Amino acid sequence: MGKLNKTEREWQRELSPEEYRITRQKGTEPAFTGQYWNTKQSGTYVCRCCGTELFSSISKYDSGCGWPSFYKPINTTAIEEHDDFSHGMVRTEIVCHHCDAHLGHVFEDGPQPTGLRYCVNSASLQLKTDEKNDEETYP
């Protein structure tokens, strides 16, 4: 599947102002405010902009940081990583492979088995719940 190319005007029409600010302008929502920071429902988290599957609720955990956190993406091609030197910091930005939506950042302070923490803005995600099993996936 190739890259999804839309104009900024198209993105602005399709997304809420907050979703646009975060996904297209590399914004960040305040900690502990996003829709999914504390969600424990089972399902698949997809890109808010294009619907690409990004994370499974199985890999979601409570990192205490106030943003949805995952220890791995749903597959190795769903996400791209880029160096981010903004705000006087050195970080690794994560974006959707299909549409380049800004998702958040990945840090090397997560749990095993990966040791990684994919820290993602809720506004970048949409949860597609499992219809068969809508129970909590982590304590």
UniProtKB/Swiss-Prot annotation:
Residues 8-130 form the MsrB domain. The keyword Repressor does not apply. This is Peptide methionine sulfoxide reductase MsrB. Keywords: Metal-binding, Oxidoreductase, Zinc. It comes from the Bacteria. One of its GO terms (molecular function) is zinc ion binding. NCBIfam families: peptide-methionine (R)-S-oxide reductase MsrB. The gene is msrB. SUPFAM superfamilies: Mss4-like. Pfam families: SelR. The lineage of its organism: Bacteria, Pseudomonadati, Pseudomonadota, Gammaproteobacteria, Moraxellales. It comes from Acinetobacter baylyi (strain ATCC 33305 / BD413 / ADP1). Binds 1 zinc ion per subunit. The zinc ion is important for the structural integrity of the protein. Its cofactor is Zn(2+). Belongs to the MsrB Met sulfoxide reductase family.
